[in-house]
Regions:
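Conserved short alpha-helical segments that host acidic/polar catalytic motifs at enzyme active sites
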Residues: 1-319
């Protein structure tokens, strides 16, 4: 699990001080999904700039220069590629018809296959996410068509963001969560991977006092927001993407269980939160979604209360 976060200011009426406070608040709140590395990207004097470090966000002072009109951020929980080598961390630089920065929340499992099949150049970057950047660079464009091609080529769980040198922001929504808000009065878009990140950050930075609209972003959507705040969209075909799990109930009937990529990642990473696979499977079987379980992992009290309630109900039903 990682987190994406950021904002785009298209009116220029929010003070630089408040926007810097918002950036840090978003980054700190996004630690709930990753503390191995943190980074942001922004445009300075017409050039894309990336600042990232192998540290949790609260130990980094994010200070985009005055006049910055968009910030794209990421907090990382390492799955592939050692975070101690900073080139493995997000955001990444990309070069097509425009220079851009790129970030990913999720896990891609066909990155090595794509590098061979598409004859992508060798790179020291070990992170699975970087293959998406290479696919865009190979096409030589950053637009709806190239993003669609990339999204339909990769396999795994994902939500991608990109920010180009013109302060145009792109969002590609796969199976991983994303929340996008529009503050029309302020001329400001703010986004983060989860609602809980946004709630914490808006409260901390004081933006909860202003009216906003929740923009629903569905799986298979590609959004573009330009520097004037104009939003346009396209779509891509969602690919079936799962792996097979364990065989069980051999004494009754051989049955094959499979999970979505987001559920698989929960099963892989749950031990980092002191939770067993059995606990996660119990919640999934009970009907909780992967997004709901992710929220619980970040709130240990809620998780323990829910597990206790589910177990008590199961024991009652078995009596």
């Amino acid at each position: 699990m990682c987190a994406l976060f950021g904002w785009l200011d298209y009116k220029g009426i929010v003070s630089d001080r408040l926007l810097k406070k918002l950036t840090q608040a978003l980054a700190n709140a996004a630690e709930e999904r990753g503390t191995d590395a943190s980074g942001i990207a922004y445009v300075k004097s017409g050039k894309v700039t990336v600042y990232k470090r192998p540290k949790p966000a609260h130990k980094i002072h994010f200070n985009a220069p005055n006049g910055t009109r968009a910030v794209m951020g990421h907090t990382r929980m390492t799955t592939q590629g050692n975070e101690k080598f900073n080139y493995n961390n997000h955001p990444f630089y990309g070069h097509a018809d425009v220079n851009f920065a790129f970030a990913h929340n999720g896990v891609l499992y066909n990155d090595k296959e794509l590098r061979t099949k598409r004859h992508l150049p060798n790179t020291q970057i070990e992170t699975d996410s970087y293959v998406a950047v290479q696919l865009l660079e190979q096409q030589g464009k950053l637009n709806f068509d190239s993003l669609k091609n990339m999204a339909e080529s990769v396999r795994g769980s994902f939500c991608f963001t990109a920010l180009d040198e013109n302060n145009t922001f792109y969002l590609v929504k796969g199976s991983n969560p994303m929340c996008l808000l529009h503050f029309a009065q302020l001329g400001l878009y703010i986004y983060a991977s989860t609602e809980s990140i946004l709630k914490k950050a808006l409260q901390k930075a004081g933006f909860h006092k202003y009216p906003f609209e929740v923009l629903h972003v569905d799986e298979g959507m590609i959004l573009e927001i330009d520097r004037y705040g104009f939003l346009s969209g396209s779509t891509f075909e969602v690919q079936e993407s799962f792996r097979f799990g364990k065989w069980y109930n051999w004494y009754d009937e051989l049955e094959e269980e499979y999970y979505t990529q987001q559920e698989e990642l929960l099963l892989e990473m749950c031990s980092c939160y002191g939770v067993t696979e059995e606990d996660v499977l119990l919640l999934l079987d009970y009907g909780y979604s992967a997004d709901e379980i992710e929220e619980m992992l970040c709130d240990s009290n809620l998780l323990l209360e829910t597990l206790c309630a589910v177990r008590c109900e199961e024991e009652f039903c078995c009596e």
